[in-house]
């Protein structure tokens, strides 16, 4: 089963929080102390909390659950996309559009438009347009791909959110809360843990730390999905590959 050790976390700098003056007092239970005016996160709390989160995400994946990775900060953007693709899940890695979950009906129409434009760009429709019209549609396609490309095949609301930086993604968390979708999130010392069902106290800026979370989650999800396939194979529903 996918797990992460304290040594892995120390090497990745998971324990380095934000400057003490930016702290959120609600994170006090997860703070070990301060060094050079920077809060140090208590990894004795983080390790079991993260491993619990991984086990639960694996369970959700084993039930064919859809997991939406959310990380729109520039530094995390590419890693979020790669991790989601790596385990055949979904992602939002540029900008969270308000209503992305709570107004799914409208989002679905935009996804339909995105798919129509993709078809047009491949079937020669764009070639028949004036240069200006083709350019306008290409721009629209790029814009839609940027914001919705990671969820265009989700086919409905996700069963869980995995969030890098609870502070930065507070709108996504609020929408998931409103819909009763469980939230798994990396919560740094400057963030509010309210609304997060599975709190992972840790550094949300260092790329090594972010990569550690993402690759562990992707592995846990893949393991969960392979359990699902193994069960189906036993029941004779699919032929084991």
From Swiss-Prot:
Gene3D superfamilies membership: Glucose-6-phosphate isomerase like protein, domain 1, Helix hairpin bin
Cross-referenced SUPFAM superfamilies: Ribosomal protein S2
Superkingdom classification of source: Bacteria
GO molecular function, one term: structural constituent of ribosome
Sorted UniProt keywords: Ribonucleoprotein, Ribosomal protein
Keyword field contains Ribonucleoprotein: yes
GO cellular component: cytosolic small ribosomal subunit
Claim: Nucleotide-binding is one of the keywords in the record: no
One annotated GO biological process: translation
NCBIfam families xref list: rpsB_bact
Similarity comment: Belongs to the universal ribosomal protein uS2 family.
UniProt name for this protein: Small ribosomal subunit protein uS2
